[in-house]
Amino acid sequence: IGAHNDKKIGIDGENSVGVHAAVQLLRDIGEGRVPDFRGKRVCVIGGGNVSMDATRTALRLGAASVTCVYRRRISDMTALNEEIEDAQAEGCQILQLQAPDHIEADENGHVAALWTRPQVIGPYGSDGRPRPYDADAPLLRTPCDIVIVAIGQAIDARPFAQVMPLERGKIKASSDAFVPNTPHVFAGGDAVTGPATVIRAVAAGKVAAANIDAHLGFHHVIQSDVEIPAPHLTNLPACGRIELHNRPFEECVGNFELVKCGMTEQEVQQETSRCLRCDHFGYGIF
C-alpha cells in the first residue's frame, strides 16, 4: 500500500489556497501536471530529501524565491548533504531553527505569509537527535505565495486494523514477514517499516515470497532465463565510486535538464564492474 499519504502539520491556515503536499505535488509534476510558480515566493517546510526535492523543483518552475523552513539546525537535517549544498548553490535560502506556527491568508483565502516560531536546540532525545523548544522571541513573518509541506509520509493502515495488528500506524510484522497472530498473512515494505528505500521494499518482497512459498509446502528454486556469466573469483582491489560533476548551478534553474554530467565510456566500464549486490542474505527460514 506504500507510504503515499502526506503528514499534516496541524496549524491554522493549512487549508489555504496555495498550500501543497510535497509528495502529491511532485507526483503531479512527474505525470505532466505542472503548476505555474513563475514569479511566486515559495516556502518549503521540512528538512528531509523530499523537502529538498520540492525546493529544487520550485526553483526549476520559475519561483522568484524559495525558502526552506526547518525547526532544527541545518546540520540536523536528514536530507543528504549533497542535496542541501546543491539547493543552496541554486539559490535556496534555508531558514533554520524556525517552527511553523500558522499560515496567514488574504481576504480571498490565498496564502500571504508563513509565520514561524524561533527555536532553541535542546537536549538529545532517544532517537539521538536534539529536540528544539520555543525561544523567548517574537514570531517571524515570511511573505510567500506558496507553501509546500514536506514533513514526512505515512501509510493508511486503518482498513487493516480489524484483521491484523498495527503498531504506531503501521502493520506489525517480524523480520521474516510473518504477521503475528494472523495466520497465512505476510507483510513487508513501507507498510511495515514506514517510508524507506525501494531496495528495502524489494528485499522485503523477496523475503515474503520465499516464506510464503515455504509456508505453502513448496521449495521452489527461482530460475532465470537470462544467461549469467560465471563470476571472476580473483580478488580484485577495492575500487572507488566514480564521482559525477554538476553542470553550473546557474544553468540548472528554470529547467529540468540533468544536473549531473554523464560518464565517459571508460568510467562506465569501471563503474559497472563494481559490486551491484543488495547484500541481503537469507529469508529468515533457513
Annotate each language-model stretch with its function.
Residues I1-D28, E265, Q269, S273-I285:
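Glycine/serine-rich phosphate-binding loop and adjoining beta1-alpha1 elements at the start
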Residues E14-A22, L26-I29, T78-D106, A113-Q119, ...:
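N-terminal glycine-rich dinucleotide-binding loop that anchors FAD/FMN and/or NAD(P) in oxidoreductases
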Residues I29, T55-H102, H220-L233:
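Rossmann-like dinucleotide-binding cores of NAD(P)H-dependent redox enzymes
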Residues R33-A63:
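Rossmann-like NAD(P)H-binding beta-loop-alpha module
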Residues G188-I222:
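A conserved FAD-binding loop/helix module that cradles the flavin
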Residues I1-G2, C43-I45, C144-G152, V268:
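Short hydrophobic core segments
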Residues N15-G39, E107, Y124-P195, N235:
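FAD-site-proximal beta/loop scaffold in flavoenzymes
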Residues A99-A105, H110, V120, V207, ...:
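Mid-to-C-terminal Rossmann-like scaffold of FAD/NAD(P)H-dependent oxidoreductases
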